[in-house]
């Protein structure tokens, strides 16, 4: 199915998703896989794609690449007349945002990738390619809703690889290999990380959804071995077991599942000498220590939460409420005719990053306090967390 207009993409989406769903049901667990790559701008994804292709060839897999920039955005909105690489990359970001906004669909680019995969699949069927399986590498994914849609369509056949490369390396790659001045390269990196618009680039929010993480830090042999290990796991090597770091992160993720916070769910664990010392989640602390757990109400014969306990029971987030009150307090001290502009500025300001006024204890703090309650020393321990610590948690971790 070849899509050439955004209107066609929206119109054909139901049939396109139906076809993909049927194929998912009819193929074996590893007869077809779709690999999405998520990374910040400046990461050398060409090198990663080549390594994935080389490794999959050892398993007799045919590997095809779907580039969102050329196979979806350019197909729908044209290549554009760019004079340099900065204009090209910035222009592609803008076009991707426009597609999401015009379609009112944040996974529109994922639908385009699915359409391209269907097209490649049909071509392989015509050519009768004799391979054990087929893999499609999507380069690259920039919005969480794209991930959700691809997982909905392909199920366990979709895998998301998060590629980490430190900012200095990415900046150098953009300057050296793309010929972009440092100031403009820095603008691209900042824009790619997290735009204000809901239809924009949200690499930071997408990255943590990955199934596997690869570190592109210049150690080529380690990167090759990490990719080998990933595919050994996928293809059922029974002797590949988790490292302790992986196990601890799994425990942190599991701990996050017990959070009922209204903003997001975070988990953390403290570990020492290859043993888990404590777990923590971001939720409202309970009198006497620890967090609220659901309890069994014998009278109603059902599990319930304590009245006035967690925020969702109360029906509001005290931190969000306090941030609104701060903004309203500032606006009330500004002349009425100027308030509209100031309100927009304040709503997009760093005030929205304030976390001090929430009732919840953060996951990292709860993990530390759990050790304190049971007289376990945290000296020389390691903390594993599903997100980066805030400034308050960072101070407590260091102390």
State the predicted function of each range.
Residues 46, 68, 80-120, 198, ...:
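Zinc-dependent deaminase catalytic domain
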